[in-house]
């Protein structure tokens, strides 16, 4: 991560996470599931308050948004655009349960894909 105050814990076995945690927050579980798929890349991923995960090598950021609709995703994309440009990220992927779309803002490609298509890409 790139901020000292922001620390997260992820599990390769998220069944273990469910057993250890009292609260069962689906969005956190979904985020952990996305990371499990990203492990297939065998590269380092970072996170900050704008992106769930991003690669400094491939210049791609990933945001797990299981329940946001397309309009809310587009609003969020406009808010994070300056940070994407600052980090040199030119492709941002929002992973959802079922929504799909893609659009460009100032040279940055924003892609909204469902988790099943995301996981089958690898």
Per-region residue spans from a language model:
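Short C-terminal domain-edge/linker segments immediately following a structured domain
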Residues: 39-42, 93-99, 122
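Accessory nucleic acid-recognition modules appended to NTPase machines
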Residues: 1-59
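Catalytic cores of nucleic-acid endonucleases
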Residues: 65-114
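Non-catalytic C-terminal interaction segments of nucleic acid-processing enzymes
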Residues: 115-122
């Amino acid at each position: 991560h790139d901020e000292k105050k922001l620390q997260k814990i992820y599990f390769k076995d998220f069944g273990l996470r469910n057993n250890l945690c009292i609260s069962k927050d689906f969005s956190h579980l979904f985020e952990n599931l996305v990371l499990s798929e990203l492990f297939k890349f065998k590269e380092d991923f970072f996170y900050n308050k704008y992106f769930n995960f991003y690669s400094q090598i491939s210049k791609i950021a990933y945001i797990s948004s299981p329940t946001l609709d397309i309009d809310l995703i587009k609003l969020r994309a406009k808010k994070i655009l300056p940070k994407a440009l600052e980090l040199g990220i030119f492709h941002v992927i929002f992973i959802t349960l079922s929504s799909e779309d893609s659009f460009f803002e100032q040279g940055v490609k924003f892609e909204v894909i469902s988790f099943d298509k995301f996981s089958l890409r690898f």
